[in-house]
Amino acid sequence: IRRACRANRCEIQRRPGKGLFKHRWYQGGVHAARFQFQEVAVARAQRSKGSLSVVLADIDHFKSVNDTYGHGAGDLVLKAVAGALVVAARSTDVVARYGGEELCLVLEGTAAEGAARLAERMRLAVKALRFDTDKGALSVTTSFGVGVWEAGDDGPGVLARADQRLYQAKARGRDRVVAS
């Protein structure tokens, strides 16, 4: 993944102590690099005729967390949510911050049912988190959208389905997993 990403002038690094991948973008290769790790996983799935799922997770009402409790609390929430996803993920899964309060998971060798089960475990783990702040207790929920690779897909196609299902999860009231 790192080698393929460097070809697009992007670097993916694992954050120390968190197990979470972060993206550092260089001018010029942003669009191609954004989907690079999904595309590498898709290429492997095509070669092996295996399964692949991409899950997008979004912290519900995150703007109001920042507005009400402050950006320090928002940072704490984001780190704790990311940590909960990393703990729930398998060692072979890629968990990356996708942007803002969105996280992306690439689950190689995982079909829709398995991805939905994992996302549900993650949703419950996030819902169980509690934060003590200067302005009182805080808890958050997370919405998940699951996209599954289908023969002939590319990385952006799988990601687009995950994004569409994340939007459906938000539209259906948040704090849920939508996989189909």
Language model features with spans:
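Catalytic-core segments of nucleotide cyclases and related cyclic-nucleotide turnover enzymes
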Residues: A112, A116-A119, V148-A179
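Conserved metal-coordinating catalytic motifs of nucleotidyl cyclase and c-di-GMP turnover enzymes
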Residues: V55-D58, G100, A162
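Catalytic core regions of nucleotide second-messenger enzymes
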Residues: R97, V126-T142
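Cytosolic catalytic cores of cyclic-nucleotide second-messenger enzymes
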Residues: R15, L20-S51, H61-G109, E113, ...
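Regulatory sensory/coupling modules that transmit signals to nucleotide-handling catalytic cores
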Residues: I1-P16
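Cell-envelope/extracellular polymer assembly enzymes that use nucleotide-activated donors
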Residues: S53, S143
